[in-house]
């Protein structure tokens, strides 16, 4: 073994297997790009993003950890969200929940 060497298993790795997902259509109504990270509570994203926030409550982007999705001004796109796991307690972000979901 070489320090830092990666030895991935054969086949494909399915992210968030068996977790609840929803799709939402999101429009950036602002005049600047907005980037949302993989573990940000989507319900609490920038107010310039127009979408059904109640559907997104308790969900985050269904993308690989450490990555993000960028919404350009005027852009509309559909994204898949995955349910937050664990204790489902949310603190921080934009302070809209600050407790159990």
Curated annotation (Swiss-Prot):
Gene Ontology CC entries for this record: urease complex
Signal peptide start-end: none
UniProt-annotated location(s): Cytoplasm
First-tier enzyme category under EC: hydrolase
Catalytic activity: urea + 2 H2O + H(+) = hydrogencarbonate + 2 NH4(+)
Keywords on record: Cytoplasm, Hydrolase
InterPro entries xref list: Urease_beta-like, Urease_betasu_sf, Urease_subunit
One GO process term, biological-process aspect: urea catabolic process
GO MF entry, a single one: urease activity
EC number: 3.5.1.5
Pathway(s) where this gene product acts: Nitrogen metabolism; urea degradation; CO(2) and NH(3) from urea (urease route): step 1/1
Keyword check for Hydrolase: yes
Subunit structure: Heterotrimer of UreA (gamma), UreB (beta) and UreC (alpha) subunits. Three heterotrimers associate to form the active enzyme.
NCBIfam families, per database record: PRK13203.1, urease_beta
Family: Belongs to the urease beta subunit family.
Protein name, as recorded: Urease subunit beta
């Amino acid at each position: 073994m070489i320090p830092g060497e990666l030895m991935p298993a054969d086949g494909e790795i399915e992210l968030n297997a068996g977790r609840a997902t929803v799709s939402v259509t999101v429009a950036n109504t602002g005049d600047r790009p907005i980037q949302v990270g993989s573990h940000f509570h989507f319900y609490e994203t920038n107010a310039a993003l127009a979408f059904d926030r109640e559907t997104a409550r308790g969900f985050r982007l269904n993308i690989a950890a450490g990555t993000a999705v960028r919404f350009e001004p005027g852009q509309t796109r559909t994204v898949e969200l995955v349910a937050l796991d664990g204790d489902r307690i949310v603190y921080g972000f934009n302070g809209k929940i600050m407790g159990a979901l």
